[in-house]
Each structure stands twice: as C-alpha cells, then as structure tokens.
Amino acid sequence: MEKDEKHIAEWYNTLSGSYDELYGEEQSHKYEMVLEFLREKHFKVLVDIGCGTGTFLEKAHEICDHSIGIDLSTRMLKIAKDRRTPNADYILASSSSLPLKDDSSDCAVSISTAKAELNLPRFLADLDRVLREDSFVAFTLFQQPGAPNSVSLSKAARSTKISDRETLYSLRPA
C-alpha cells in the first residue's frame, strides 16, 4: 500500500462508524443512478471497488450471482461484512492493484473512489485487466471544480455530472 493510500485508509477507519450517517444520503443518490444504468441486467460477478460500508452491494445483490467488495479500510470492510449481503465477499486492497484474476468480472462499479489527477490511468488499466469483454462499467470520478474534463474514454462512455466536483461515467459493451 502506498503512503497516500495508508493515509486514506486511516481516515476512513476513523470515519467508519459515522460514515453512513454523514454521507449515506449523498451516496444513495449515486447508487440509484448506477443501478438505473445497470437495470434489467444480470451479472455473474459484480465488483465494487471502494465498497466502503457495503451499501451498494446490499442494494445490488439481486442483479448478480456473486459480488466482490474491495476497500482500503479494514473498519469499513467490517461494517460491509456485518451487513451479511448474500453471495458477497470482501477484500482489503487498493483500487490501483486489484487482487483479481484477469477477465474475472462482467461488471465493475466504483463510486467516489477515483481522482482524475491521481490514480486514473492505473485504475483504468487494472479495470481493463479484470473485466471480461462485453462488461459493464460505472464509476464516478472526482475532478477539481472548474477544471477542464481531461478524461478520455471510449465513445461508448456516457457521462453525467453529479456535483460540481464529481462525474459519473458509464460504459456499456460496444
């Protein structure tokens, strides 16, 4: 784990007990947008990168056979595990070094994890590695307010600004 990631993990470990109370409503809106994008689909393996307290996987468990939540924070993962979401596993790991086999997932979601100026290239490269062809992807990306959109994604990507600093990108199979 890199130095910045250790600081992030420590911050979320400290925040974990009150995270849902503080950010639950804001995050719930994002989860609903992603679930709308994924509606009427069913996946073999759905991966939630930066799963936090596991709320998204709890809401999405009916659209997949198996789900995997990945997060840097041990305490956030404990809360996620305590939800007892059916057919869900949780892994302590970084979003830029996913401990998953190549071509192992057909859907990946990452909400409020990636930052355009920091880890985006590694994040996208690792996503590409673990996703099967014809996979669905939905992720939000933090960018500095007023900064130009420097993200270059395939033509299949749709973007929706969800706040002054965060954009939702959704990609369907070509």
Residue ranges and their predicted role:
Residues 107-119:
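A short SAM/SAH-binding and catalytic strip from SAM-dependent methyltransferases
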Residues 96-108:
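A short acidic, Gly/Pro-enriched loop at the edge of an enzyme's catalytic core
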Residues 1-40, 145-147:
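Conserved class I S-adenosyl-L-methionine
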